[in-house]
């Protein structure tokens, strides 16, 4: 291989201005070039997005990323700078095609916030081979990340039993992924995020007050740590009011709680404990706060929490949780492992037959059956336009998302949050268990 082409960006310049069309894999473009050359580029096709299986032991997943995809589609372009780069390995006809590229196809799929299971046809992308193949990496980048985060977040929401959770993982992931993670967590039921960009871009409520550094900043050389903590708390209360949250574990939690109430009075909004035996410390802090008259002061805990440690704290006097690393890494499942497979050409089903990686052919839609109580019982995948006759309660899952390249779906976060909440309520009792198990409901596919 020869040397790489010269980069246009100088070292030290920001790297977040890459043309959206370049957020892809090279082989999408080399396939396009070959298809344009042999005349197959304009053949009508359908690509399907699905997961062959859930992450090990998971019982359901939560679809997230739909809104971000619809937001990204109009920006998925190849500008002059991008085309200059691509001309180094693509023929002129392909570069001309990319210069004028606009996705003008249709997309159907599950609404954002919908639950999914193995084989669920989460997205169906229709258009010419040329325009559909170019979207593969963009679609999978968004859905594999956001769905992994939302699926982990939903498990944490269930484990918290109605207590609020705050997403605090920005410093544990890429700066752009942090914004998407905050959005996905909020969809799944988190109450807020520490990320201000997520607030500005998506309206996710932002929470945050102070770190240990602020307390240590007030230490005097050789002076007692207790005085430093008091000074820090007084400064924070004077700036933010008594309803603020004071971090009480920089030195000693018992002393920290006393200093917090002394600084803010009985109207202190909350204390946060970020280390140690959180359950034990929360009990001790609750008793101490009540003795000091701060009976309405809330207790927030944080520090390497995941769904399992959150569940273990359900019996403790904890009012809310701050979750970082485990959330933004998918709590052990950093990708949803979704794939983007060609399932139809010229209206005729096609399918991959490789061992362990089979993908049923044909464009598909889905519905979900349930009992009269609302508890879901089965996911039924059927050929598009040919739904089976079902007399028991059911709900259609496949909805129009894009028509002729234009978004047509409601992608509001409020609607997605409501869909997640109702979906979790509809699961069978075993479906919410954190212990490893089979998918909460079976998926049955009617062949084309």
Curated annotation (Swiss-Prot):
Residues 1-21, 353-372 are annotated as: Disordered. It comes from the Bacteria. Its EC number is 6.3.4.21. Keywords: Ligase, Phosphoprotein, Pyridine nucleotide biosynthesis, Transferase. It is an enzyme of class 6 (ligase). Transiently phosphorylated on a His residue during the reaction cycle. Phosphorylation strongly increases the affinity for substrates and increases the rate of nicotinate D-ribonucleotide production. Dephosphorylation regenerates the low-affinity form of the enzyme, leading to product release. GO terms for molecular function: nicotinate phosphoribosyltransferase activity; transferase activity. InterPro entries: Aldolase_TIM, N/Namide_PRibTrfase, NAPRTase_N, Nic_PRibTrfase-Fam, Nic_PRibTrfase_pncB, Nicotinate_pribotase-like_C. The modification Phosphohistidine is found at residue 212. The keyword NAD does not apply. One of its GO terms (cellular component) is cytosol. Signal peptide: none annotated. Involved in the Preiss-Handler pathway, which is a recycling route that permits the salvage of free nicotinamide (NM) and nicotinic acid (Na) involved in the NAD biosynthesis. Catalyzes the synthesis of beta-nicotinate D-ribonucleotide from nicotinate and 5-phospho-D-ribose 1-phosphate at the expense of ATP. It is not able to use nicotinamide. PncB1 contributes to basal NAD level. Belongs to the NAPRTase family. This is Nicotinate phosphoribosyltransferase pncB1. It comes from Mycobacterium tuberculosis (strain CDC 1551 / Oshkosh). The gene is pncB1.
């Amino acid at each position: 291989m020869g040397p790489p082409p010269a980069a246009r960006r100088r070292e030290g310049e920001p790297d977040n201005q890459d043309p959206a069309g370049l957020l892809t894999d090279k082989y999408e473009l080399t396939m396009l070039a070959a298809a344009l050359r042999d005349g197959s580029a304009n053949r009508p096709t359908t690509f399907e997005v699905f997961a062959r299986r859930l992450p090990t032991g998971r019982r359901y997943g939560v679809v997230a990323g739909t809104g971000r995809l619809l937001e990204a589609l109009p920006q998925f372009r190849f500008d002059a700078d991008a085309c200059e780069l691509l001309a180094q390995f693509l023929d002129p006809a392909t570069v001309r095609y990319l210069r004028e590229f606009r996705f003008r196809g249709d997309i159907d799929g599950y609404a954002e916030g919908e639950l999914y299971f193995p084989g669920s046809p989460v997205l169906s992308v229709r258009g010419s081979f040329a325009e559909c193949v170019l979207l593969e990496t963009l679609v999978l980048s968004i859905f594999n990340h956001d769905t992994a985060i939302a699926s982990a977040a939903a498990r944490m929401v269930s484990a918290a039993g109605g207590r609020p959770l705050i997403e605090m993982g920005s410093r544990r992931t890429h700066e752009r992924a942090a914004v998407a993670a905050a959005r996905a967590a909020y969809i799944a039921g988190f109450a807020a995020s520490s990320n201000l960009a997520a607030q500005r871009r998506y309206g996710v409520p932002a929470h945050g007050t102070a770190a240990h550094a602020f307390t240590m900043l007030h230490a005097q050389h050789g002076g007692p740590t207790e005085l430093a903590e008091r000074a820090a708390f007084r400064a924070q209360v004077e700036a933010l009011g008594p309803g603020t949250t004071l971090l009480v574990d920089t030195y000693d939690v018992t002393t920290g709680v006393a200093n917090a109430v002394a600084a803010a009075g009985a109207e202190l909004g909350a204390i946060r404990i970020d280390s140690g035996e959180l359950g034990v410390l929360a009990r001790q802090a609750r008793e101490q706060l009540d003795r000091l008259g701060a009976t309405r002061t809330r207790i927030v805990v944080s520090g390497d929490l995941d769904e399992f440690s959150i569940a273990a704290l359900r019996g403790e006097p904890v009012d809310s949780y701050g979750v970082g690393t485990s959330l933004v890494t998918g709590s052990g499942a950093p990708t949803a492992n979704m794939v983007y497979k060609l399932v139809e050409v010229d209206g005729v089903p096609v399918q991959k037959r490789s061992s362990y990686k089979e993908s049923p052919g044909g464009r598909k839609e889905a519905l979900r059956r349930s009992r009269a109580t609302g508890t879901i019982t089965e996911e039924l995948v059927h050929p598009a336009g040919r739904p089976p006759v079902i007399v028991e309660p059911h709900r259609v899952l496949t909805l129009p998302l894009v028509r002729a390249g234009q978004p047509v779906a409601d992608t509001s976060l409020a609607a997605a949050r409501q869909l997640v909440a109702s979906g979790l309520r509809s699961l069978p009792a075993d479906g919410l268990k954190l212990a490893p198990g089979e998918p909460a409901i079976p998926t049955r596919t009617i062949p084309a």
